[in-house]
Amino acid sequence: MLLCIDTGNTNTVFSVWDGEKFVGLWRISTDHRRTADEYFVWLSTLISLQKLELNIDACIISSTAPRVVFNLRVLCNRYFDTRPLVVGKPDCLLPVAPRVDFGTVVGPDRLVNTWGAFERHGPDLIVVDFGTATTFDVVDTDGAYVGGVIAPGVNLSLEALHMGAASLPHVDVTMPAKVIGTNTVACIQSGIFWGYIGLVQGVVDKIRLERGRPMKVIATGGLAPLFDQGFDLFDAIEDDLTMHGLRLIHDYNKEMGNG
């Protein structure tokens, strides 16, 4: 079985695959102080509660939080007796290399999402990921990542507004009943919701114009469904896009005799 691990700035997600069959997914908050032993106890407990067997013989990691990777490597080495692939490291091969400026480091999650989306939806894509940052990734005709856009994430924007303006409360984002708010909470919710609708529409339109061709828009991330309420922003929403991409990259490395 394959263990896929995706570490973001907010959450770390684990999934297990038996070949191409998805077995399960579990999520924990990202904490660089968490040890390999703690990860194992947590993961093995959840897996046993679902009456699954922990027969892991391969691991792959994608991480935007470098301080966490060390303990995840130890987890894979100590408890599963395997050397994990780490996306973005020289020993982890990619099916198609990104085409960006020399010296540019592309977030591994963006590379993983690019290939996962290409495998499912074909060429000429814009992948919108609603994470800690809201990212737009452009996928070329051969599946290569060719650049994109990074904007503050929804929750990050809410937190910044609350922290930067003492009189403004922290609110949950939701689709407001109308654009013009008649109280502070409604005004903030409207600004965030309609602001991000406009952000997505505007950036997608400009990417399509710059590329000069039709492009499908694939959304992922926990907040993606919030912005898919009759606005025709997305051609598809993929909840498990990163995990799917990690499995594909692992399988590619295996085919190439690497891992």
Curated annotation (Swiss-Prot):
Residue sites binding ATP per the record: 6-13, 132
Give the range the annotation lists for the signal sequence.
Answer: none
Positions with a binding annotation for substrate: 107-110, 184
Cellular component terms per the entry's GO annotation: cytoplasm
Which keywords does UniProt give here? ATP-binding, Coenzyme A biosynthesis, Cytoplasm, Kinase, Metal-binding, Nucleotide-binding, Potassium, Transferase
Query: Which cofactors are named for this entry?
Result: NH4(+); K(+)
Q: What reaction gets catalysed by this protein?
A: (R)-pantothenate + ATP = (R)-4'-phosphopantothenate + ADP + H(+)
Q: Where in the cell is it found?
A: Cytoplasm
Q: What's the EC number here?
A: 2.7.1.33
Family according to the record: Belongs to the type III pantothenate kinase family.
Q: What is this protein called?
A: Type III pantothenate kinase
Task: Give the species.
Answer: Paracoccus denitrificans (strain Pd 1222)
| Gene name for this UniProt entry | coaX
